[in-house]
Regions:
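Phosphate-binding site of ATP-dependent enzymes
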Residues: 129-219
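Conserved N-proximal alpha/beta basic substrate-recognition cap immediately N-terminal to
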Residues: 1-94
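Protein kinase-like catalytic core scaffold
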Residues: 115, 156, 178-179, 224, ...
Length: 272
């Protein structure tokens, strides 16, 4: 859910909303202007590279954009996300970065199996793998080394959090946390809806709200999807932050109009 729904809701609110497709977006470096009268851009490109670059270009034109390119960098690069949050004492899964397979294997042993290896950039749970022992880890490391990943020689390795068969997705819009979901997967340890997890309504308690807003203050941005694990001993752990969050399943199970809420809050923000 994204551009089309935002346009429909914008019309209902009396706003003039249109979609600019990245495939049609061309900007010369010496011609910083857009013909239309624009107050705000909302980034909905599911391609990280295109989202990052188009947000950057729009900012150079002098327009506000949700989200700005620096927020997207901090969100979409898992190394940046994890280490920035950890520096600010946000609870996160234990993670290390290695630039060599030997070190990756050595420190995985110290971390303790099973471990999870993730691509530095990516979404929907793609290429996220659990290694139960050294042999399995070596296979994953070797596969990554010869893949076409952008960061194929940088290894992002994380503890396996023994969470319930679910995780939490909370949406932050402006300074509010209006809605969230549980993502439950009975058949896979990965709880992405793209991998078969089902969405269920979430009642956001004060602890979750406070944590999500702290993350927003650290990462920046206006519209975020924050993924949180529940650990029986440590409580809530922030796993990832999405700078262009999808929300179709959240709307469906909560009967909450995210597009309308986002547009109203965005207009308030621009007017300030």
């Amino acid at each position: 859910m994204g551009g089309k729904n935002l346009i429909e809701e914008g019309k209902k609110l009396g706003y003039q909303v249109t979609t600019i497709y990245s495939k049609d977006f061309v900007l010369f470096s010496n011609e910083f202007n857009i013909e239309n009268d624009v107050n705000l851009f909302i980034q909905r490109n599911i391609s990280h590279n295109r989202a990052l670059i188009t947000s950057f270009l729009v900012e150079q034109l002098g327009y506000p954009v949700i989200n700005d390119h620096m927020t997207l960098i901090r969100c979409e690069n898992k190394i940046f996300t994890t280490y920035i949050l950890a520096k600010h004492n946000i609870p996160t899964p234990k993670t290390f970065i290695a630039f060599d397979k030997t070190n990756a294997m050595e420190y995985s042993k110290k971390l303790g199996y099973p471990v999870v290896i993730k691509p530095v950039e990516g979404s929907w749970g793609r290429m996220v793998a659990k290694a139960d022992n050294l042999d399995v880890l070596y296979s994953y490391l070797e596969y990554q080394e010869f893949s076409t990943q952008k960061y194929k020689d940088i290894y992002y390795i994380q503890e396996f959090v023994n969470k319930p068969n679910r995780d939490i997705r909370i949406f932050v819009i402006g300074d509010e946390t209006p809605v969230g979901i549980y993502r439950v997967n009975e058949n896979n340890w990965r709880t992405n809806t793209a991998l078969g997890a089902k969405a269920y309504p979430l009642k956001i308690d004060e602890e979750l709200k406070e944590l999500a807003l702290k993350v927003k203050d650290i990462i920046g941005g206006f519209f975020l999807g924050i993924d949180i694990f529940e650990d029986k001993d440590r409580g809530y752990l922030v796993d990832e932050v999405n700078g262009v969050p999808e929300y179709k399943n959240t709307v469906r199970v909560n009967n909450f109009n995210i597009s309308k809420f986002l547009l109203e809050k965005a207009v308030e923000w621009v007017k300030k």
